């Protein structure tokens, strides 16, 4: 809908005006308005629609007013002027009824339904609007069905789209009325109609159905299904150039990521949505809402960080509670744990982490029971019910709400009874028991009235109003209730105003509750909870406060509007419904951390220890500062802890309000003994800022100044004669993540922190220590032993790090200088990457969370540094970085020498390649270019062809997953000539690509003398293309062909394999995964073993292999002529018998080293004896292949933490759902048979001596079975002493020392 269309329509309008043709004049005015409307220019569109309307009213008959009324109603709706929209839409309907025009009546009813629906979404309590929307949508559906079955004469469309859109609108309405199951049914029916009627794949009607199904499955917590439908919606809108719909799709996807705590992904989606929204002229409301939602996500990230801190606090307090058993401090410790759990419950609800919420609520229930406090226990029952309610397990939520009511009734707590009754009503409403729900709400109202609790009365009345209006359709009763609700609100506001006037001078009364938050989710999004829970930490921290009465203030419930934050897509996209995400309250920073890290430099001549430059015997106290903690910081998630110090603990215990920040004790520091903190550098470990350092008030033995979350301060620097650094680790979380794989990451982290804290004069030398080994208790630690030491120790741990020399890291020094000059915080991830770099000219900063701004210091440093390889992959870099790279290479004195640029998985657009075209020095230097997984689109076609044509040194090009089509592939083919040095080309996963463009490309590649590797995975190849492929694969130089998921079939695969291996002197790599291969393919390979004599790596995963094919494959592996070194058979439906056959065949095989047999035996069908492996996790021990089981936590907690995003995952109810130990998940095989299979597998595995990597993931093996298999793996003579394993949940990797079983992304693997 470009400017040319508008100009042409305006010319036609002026021409009609000149000749006086009023009908044509009105038609063209409407046409101009429609073009402008679709372009997002609503104000200008309104002007032209008004011209159309004025002409039609003055000069044309009544029937000609129908289209102009419809257009005006539509544009006013998009401008959110509902009053004007309704005027013209009702006039449209009136005219249609007068003319007895069924088509126009259907359109008018649809528009009226949409307008009333939008009014409902924008209003606070407009139940009449939703009823009107329901009436008009149902009428539109009936009319659409009539038109579909009996279309009017002369109408050829059949009104299929209108009928499908009617299903969409009804489904959207059901969703907004909290009927997601009904919505799913009708929306699925709409998709079914699309399929039956063969509606185009990329059709707007499908887009709207997928959009709303995404919302439905989000409401049902079916995250995978929701994502699938949302991505389909986005894809369709992108294909049909529906910018507004694509933006709304990205908003939906962002909401999904936010609800599953994937905040980085959510921000990325909002960024895309914002770019799309800003491209439309009059969508400022949409842009503002996206910006608002982005802020909410950032607040959620902060809350999640706080939650993780408080988890550490809980761990510490739980340990203290255990230690205090049987002492006078026991109850006090229990109250502190209870208060901490309350805070965790609040924060988990803020970020929709309902599985965690359930975990904490059950622990709160348990500890409330131990406290013998019936009120706290009844409140805890209510919180457990809230968890189940939000996890959509309504039967269980009802059970706990009823128990809460019974508990509060037993102690005569009226507020608790009222809230429990309201929550019971919510649960009954969710399962369709509307009469029971109404009775529960009315009972809750009577109790609240009796207890004189106006806020709870209001909440109950609103729920009663909801039931009468929306469930029973009793408009008269609903109207009476609305008046009662309004009167109650007015009286409550008056009372609050009076109270605030009386209390405005009461400083002491308000101080204790100054920071009590009333931002707990209300009844519209989660069950009601007593306000006593919000102030619980006040009561819990002092036993004297145990009997504090419940606070009566409660936010009124709004169950009716709990879906309002979700925008639906209607039959024609009209406006962007603002999503009122629950604003995450800025909660007080709660600090945590059981242990902390201190690095102590020892001096041979003195035993004085320096902690932050403070002598051990000093007695000064340093002010505490607030801290922001990174959720991904490896070592410093628990930065400071109020309870680390007895004096502070006492203040917390004795104070009347733990929400009021403690005032720091101001004591003048001993300046002669403490160095200034002004030179400290805060390390931005995850792109967020860290503030200052933290020093705790000392204990009775002297002051212990401690570092904050992001800092380890070195105020004394010396290279001691024994070249050792003493490390006292006080926080087990510090090193657990780093050392869970090996101890090298621990060494690297400590080294980088050491360097950061050096004085400037030492730092300027760029010298960093090389930590040779870590020692503990006089012995050298073996790999991963630090993990066990930290886990098992209840006290501080002192580790000695032996320094084995010093290494000069020039680029690190340059980077730090540029950070200082640009006022940017250094990135810890980037520093670690630079430190471990072995080749100075090879710069690998992949996965450092770099953005254009944070990458600037590195690019600045590279101006005075030579580059042979630059890896910026897996970051968030955009075209701005590419422009700086062009300037970097253009200004560099390095005019010659090979250059590798790895830029995959970023945010580069098509013009990023333009920067390469504008840099002549790259024409001579660039040898490897990887820009895969960037949204380049066909707009980069001319740039890409220029690069291929002019970069004569280029031998490797990767443009996979770049949204390219035939046009770009054809341009690349045209740019190739016989002089090109291209050797490797990856174009996979780009669609659609036509057969002719692929054939042209293959023909050009066949003329290249040195072409060796081609990847076309994910591109569907026709039989004609396969024929063209034979000529290329016969070329002697070709050594790697990847055509997975290409659909070439068995015959094509046989011909390709024959051609590829034809007279090949060198080995080749072949990927035929997911190609629909039949058993005849494997039989052919077995019959002509020369076909596989040249294959080094062979991927046939994803092809279902029958018993006949398995036998042939087994025979092939036994043949000594087979040279296959790597074989992938994942997802081949081998089953246990097939696994056994393949492994048994390896006893005589001398070549196969890597075998992937994952996803072949379904867990539900063939779980081998004992518990499934996912119920326990096993930690890898690298000492002689032994394995140490990690102590399992409580079953509830373990299941809760397994996956916060699993659909329908719930924690076992400890009281009525005991988990059975040692039961198998299936009985499809008898136990003796299962034991026999494992025994045979073990025997075969011990004889497969050549094998070095074996992947058995997702095959349903139990812990006992895997233990048996691993014993056989490690007992093999070729693997004795070097056997390793990685077993966690369903991941099962057996390997040998020196091999990497996993960890490298598929897109980053280099041959």
From Swiss-Prot:
GO CC terms, sorted: chromosome; nucleoplasm; nucleus
SUPFAM superfamilies the record matches: RNI-like, TPR-like
UniProt note on tissues of expression: Preferentially expressed in the shoot apex than in the leaves and stems. Expressed in the shoot apex and root tips in 5-day-old seedlings. At the shoot apex it is expressed in young leaves and in broad areas between two cotyledons. Weakly or not expressed in vascular tissues except vascular tissue near the shoot apical meristem. In the root, it extends from the root apical meristem to the elongation zone.
Keywords recorded for this protein, A-Z: Chromatin regulator, Chromosome, Coiled coil, DNA damage, DNA repair, Leucine-rich repeat, Nucleus, Repeat, TPR repeat
Effect of gene knockout: Abnormal enlargement of the shoot apical meristem associated with a disrupted cellular and subcellular organization. Release of transcriptional gene silencing of heterochromatic genes, and ectopic gene expression and organogenesis. Under-expression of FLC and early flowering in short days.
Residue ranges with Polar residues bias: 515-533
Entry's induction text: Under cell cycle-dependent control with a peak of expression at the S phase.
One GO BP annotation of this record: G2/M transition of mitotic cell cycle
Source organism, top-level taxon: Eukaryota
One Gene Ontology term of the molecular function aspect: histone binding
Compartments where located: Nucleus, Nucleoplasm; Chromosome
Homology family: Belongs to the Tonsoku family.
Function: Histone reader involved in homologous recombination-mediated repair of double-strand breaks (DSBs) at stalled or collapsed replication forks. Specifically recognizes and binds histone H3.1 lacking methylation at 'Lys-27' (H3K27me1). Involved in structural and functional stabilization of chromatin; represents a link between response to DNA damage and epigenetic gene silencing. Required for cell arrangement in root and shoot apical meristems. May be involved, when interacting with TSA1, in the organization of spindle microtubules.
Name of the protein in its database record: Protein TONSOKU
The encoding gene: TSK
């Amino acid at each position: 809908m470009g400017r040319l269309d508008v100009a042409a329509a305006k010319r036609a309008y002026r021409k009609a005006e000149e000749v006086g043709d009023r009908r044509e004049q009105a038609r063209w005015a409407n046409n101009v308005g429609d073009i402008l409307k679709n372009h997002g220019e609503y104000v200008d569109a309104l002007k032209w629609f008004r011209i159309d309307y004025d002409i039609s009213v003055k000069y044309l008959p009544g029937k000609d007013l129908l289209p102009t009324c419809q257009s005006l109603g539509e544009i006013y709706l998009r401008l959110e002027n509902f009053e004007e929209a309704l005027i013209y839409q009702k006039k449209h309907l009136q005219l249609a009824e007068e003319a007895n025009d069924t088509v126009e009546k259907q359109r008018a009813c649809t528009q009226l339904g949409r307008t009333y629906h939008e009014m409902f979404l924008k209003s606070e309590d407009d139940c009449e609007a939703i009823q009107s929307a329901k009436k008009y949508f149902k009428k539109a559906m009936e009319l659409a069905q009539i038109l579909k079955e009996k279309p009017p004469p002369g109408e050829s469309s059949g009104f299929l789209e209108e009928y499908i859109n009617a299903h969409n609108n009804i489904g959207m309405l059901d969703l907004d009325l909290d009927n997601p199951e009904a919505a799913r049914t009708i929306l699925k029916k709409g998709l079914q109609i699309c399929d039956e009627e063969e509606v185009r794949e990329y059709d707007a009607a499908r887009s709207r159905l997928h959009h709303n199904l995404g919302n439905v499955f989000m409401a049902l917590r079916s995250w995978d299904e929701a994502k699938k439908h949302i991505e389909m919606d986005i894809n369709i809108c992108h294909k049909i150039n529906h910018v507004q719909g694509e933006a709304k799709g990205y908003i939906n996807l962002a909401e999904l990521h936010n609800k599953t705590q994937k905040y980085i992904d959510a921000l990325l989606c909002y960024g895309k949505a914002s770019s799309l929204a800003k491209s439309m002229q009059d969508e400022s409301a949409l842009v503002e809402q996206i910006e608002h939602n982005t802020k909410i996500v950032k607040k959620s990230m902060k809350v999640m960080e706080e939650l993780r801190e408080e988890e550490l606090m809980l761990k510490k307090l739980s340990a203290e509670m255990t230690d205090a058993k049987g002492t006078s401090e026991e109850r006090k410790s229990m109250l502190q744990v209870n208060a901490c759990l309350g805070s965790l419950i609040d924060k988990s609800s803020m970020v929709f982490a309902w599985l965690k919420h359930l975990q904490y609520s059950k622990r709160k229930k348990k500890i409330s029971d131990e406290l013998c406090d019936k009120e706290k226990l009844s409140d805890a029952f209510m919180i457990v019910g809230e968890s189940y309610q939000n996890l959509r397990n309504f039967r269980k939520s009802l059970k706990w709400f009823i128990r809460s009511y019974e508990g509060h009734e037993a102690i005569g707590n009226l507020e608790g009874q009222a809230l429990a009754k309201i929550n019971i009503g919510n649960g009954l409403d969710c399962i369709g028991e509307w009469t029971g729900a109404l009775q529960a709400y009315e009972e809750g109202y009577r109790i609240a009235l009796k207890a004189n609790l106006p806020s709870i009365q209001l909440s109950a009345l609103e729920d009663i109003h909801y039931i009468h209006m929306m469930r029973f359709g009793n408009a008269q009763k609903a109207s009476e209730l609305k008046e009662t609700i309004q009167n109650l609100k007015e009286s409550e506001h008056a009372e609050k105003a009076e109270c605030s006037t009386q209390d405005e001078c009461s400083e002491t009364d308000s101080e204790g509750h100054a920071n009590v938050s009333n931002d707990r989710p209300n009844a519209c999004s989660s069950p009601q909870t007593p306000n006593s829970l919000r102030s619980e930490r006040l009561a819990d921290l002092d036993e004297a406060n145990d009997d504090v009465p419940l606070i009566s203030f409660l936010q009124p419930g709004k169950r009716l509007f709990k879906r309002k934050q979700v925008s639906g897509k209607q039959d024609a996209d009209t406006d962007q419904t603002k999503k009122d995400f629950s604003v995450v309250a800025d909660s007080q920073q709660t600090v945590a951390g059981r242990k902390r890290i201190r690095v102590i430099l020892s001096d041979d001549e003195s035993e004085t220890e320096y902690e932050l430059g403070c002598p051990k015997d000093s007695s000064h106290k340093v002010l505490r500062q607030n801290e922001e903690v990174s959720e991904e910081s490896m070592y410093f998630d628990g930065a400071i802890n109020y309870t680390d110090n007895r004096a502070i603990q006492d203040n917390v215990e004795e104070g009347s309000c733990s929400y009021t920040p403690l005032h720091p004790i101001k004591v003048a520091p001993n300046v002669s003994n403490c160095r200034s903190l002004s030179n400290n550098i805060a390390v931005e470990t995850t792109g967020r800022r860290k503030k200052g350092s933290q020093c705790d008030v000392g204990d009775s033995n002297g002051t212990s100044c401690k570092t904050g979350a992001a800092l380890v301060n070195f105020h004394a620097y010396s290279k001691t004669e024994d070249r050792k650094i003493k490390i006292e680790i006080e926080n087990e979380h510090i090193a657990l993540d780093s050392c869970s794989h090996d101890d090298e990451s621990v060494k690297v982290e400590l080294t980088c922190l050491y360097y950061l804290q050096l004085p400037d004069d030492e730092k300027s030398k760029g010298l960093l220590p090389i930590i040779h080994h870590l020692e503990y208790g006089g012995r050298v630690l073996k790999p991963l032993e630090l993990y066990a030491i930290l886990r098992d120790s209840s006290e501080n741990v002192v580790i000695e790090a032996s320094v084995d020399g010093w290494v000069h890291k020039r680029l690190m020094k340059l980077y730090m200088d540029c950070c200082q000059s640009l006022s940017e915080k250094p990135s810890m991830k980037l520093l670690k990457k630079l430190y471990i770099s072995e080749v100075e000219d090879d710069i690998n900063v992949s996965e450092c969370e770099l953005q254009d701004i944070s990458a600037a210091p590195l690019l600045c440093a590279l101006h005075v540094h030579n580059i042979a390889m630059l890896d910026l992959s897996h970051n968030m870099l955009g075209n701005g970085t590419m422009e700086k790279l062009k300037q970097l290479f253009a200004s560099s004195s390095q005019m010659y020498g090979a250059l590798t640029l790895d830029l995959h998985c970023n945010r580069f657009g098509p013009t990023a390649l333009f920067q390469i075209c504008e840099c002549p020095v790259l024409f001579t230097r660039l040898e490897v270019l990887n820009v895969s997984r960037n949204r380049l689109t066909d707009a980069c076609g001319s740039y890409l062809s220029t690069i291929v044509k002019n970069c004569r040194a280029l031998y490797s090009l990767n443009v996979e997953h770049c949204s390219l089509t035939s046009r770009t592939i054809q341009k690349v083919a045209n740019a190739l000539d016989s002089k090109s040095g291209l050797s490797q080309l990856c174009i996979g996963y780009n669609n659609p690509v036509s057969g002719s463009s692929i054939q042209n490309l293959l023909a050009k590649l066949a003329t290249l003398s040195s072409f060796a590797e081609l990847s076309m995975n994910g591109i569907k190849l026709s039989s004609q293309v396969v024929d063209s492929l034979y000529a290329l694969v016969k070329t002697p130089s070709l050594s790697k062909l990847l055509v997975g998921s290409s659909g070439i079939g068995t015959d094509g695969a046989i011909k390709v394999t024959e051609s590829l291996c034809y007279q090949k002197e060198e080995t080749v790599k072949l990927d035929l995964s997911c190609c629909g291969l039949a058993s005849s393919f494997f039989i052919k390979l077995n019959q002509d073993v020369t076909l596989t004599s040249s294959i080094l790596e062979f991927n046939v995963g994803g092809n279902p292999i029958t018993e006949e094919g398995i036998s042939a494959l087994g025979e092939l592996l036994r043949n000594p002529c087979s040279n296959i070194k790597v074989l992938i058979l994942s997802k081949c439906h081998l089953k246990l018998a097939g696994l056994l056959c393949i492994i048994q065949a390896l006893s005589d095989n001398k070549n196969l080293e890597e075998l992937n047999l994952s996803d072949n035996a379904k867990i539900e069908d063939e779980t081998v004896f004992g518990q499934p492996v996912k119920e326990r996790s096993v930690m890898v021990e690298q000492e002689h292949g032994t394995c140490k089981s990690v102590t399992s936590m409580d079953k509830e907690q373990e299941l809760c933490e397994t996956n916060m995003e699993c659909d329908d995952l719930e924690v076992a109810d400890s009281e009525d759902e005991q988990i059975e130990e040692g039961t198998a998940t299936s009985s499809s095989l008898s136990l003796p048979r299962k034991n026999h299979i494992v025994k045979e597998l073990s025997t075969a595995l011990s004889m497969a001596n050549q094998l070095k990597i074996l992947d058995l993931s997702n095959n349903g093996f139990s812990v006992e079975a895997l233990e048996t298999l691993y014993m056989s793996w490690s007992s093999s003579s070729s693997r004795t002493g070097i056997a390793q394993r990685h077993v966690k949940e369903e991941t099962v990797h057996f390997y040998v020392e020196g091999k990497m079983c996993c960890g490298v992304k598929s897109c980053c693997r280099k041959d």
